[in-house]
């Protein structure tokens, strides 16, 4: 199996693994990661969330619409840019965060089982180089 395909396979397996646990919370992988980022930032502009998630803007819009319908987030217009919106967690969204964080940590621990700290560091360095090599190539 070539390296690019292997990276894609691991990514898909990780998402599938997480989705198994997130299903009990009524969330998808994308929704959970969006909630995690919003929690970490406390208040984030939708454009910044798009950049952090690194997925299609329309996919982010769908994720946010679903989270809003579930009353996990609220969106308000930015004073400095009426075209943009601030996104914050509701109390319900904040209550879910510890469970999401636990699932993310559990997934990382499962993925990295049997891989020592030096190997993890090497892998991180290689993946960051690969990411840097591709940044801006499609713009």
PLM regions with names:
Residues 1-25, 72:
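N-terminal leader segment of winged-helix/HTH proteins
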Residues 15, 47, 65-128:
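Charged, amphipathic alpha-helical coiled-coil/dimerization segments
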Residues 19, 23, 39, 54, ...:
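Residue-level detection of the helix-turn-helix DNA-binding "recognition helix"
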Residues 34-35:
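Short alpha-helical "packing" element that flanks the helix-turn-helix/winged-helix DNA-binding module
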Residues 41-45:
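Short capping segments at the starts of secondary-structure elements
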Residues 50:
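The alpha-helix within a helix-turn-helix
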Residues 56-59:
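Helix-turn-helix DNA-binding motif, specifically the short coil turn and the N-cap/start of the second
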């Amino acid at each position: 199996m070539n390296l690019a395909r292997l990276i894609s396979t691991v990514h898909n397996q990780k998402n599938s693994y997480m989705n198994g646990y997130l299903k009990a919370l009524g969330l998808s992988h994308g929704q959970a990661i969006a909630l995690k980022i919003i929690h970490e930032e406390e208040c984030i502009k939708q454009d910044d969330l798009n950049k952090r998630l690194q997925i299609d803007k329309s996919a982010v819009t769908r994720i946010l619409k679903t989270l809003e319908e579930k009353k996990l987030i609220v969106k308000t217009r930015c004073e400095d840019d009426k075209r943009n919106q601030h996104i914050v967690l509701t109390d319900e969204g904040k209550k879910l965060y510890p469970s999401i964080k636990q699932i993310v940590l559990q997934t990382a621990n499962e993925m990295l089982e049997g891989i020592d700290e030096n190997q993890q560091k090497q892998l991180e360095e290689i993946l960051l180089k690969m990411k840097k090599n591709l940044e801006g190539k499609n713009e």
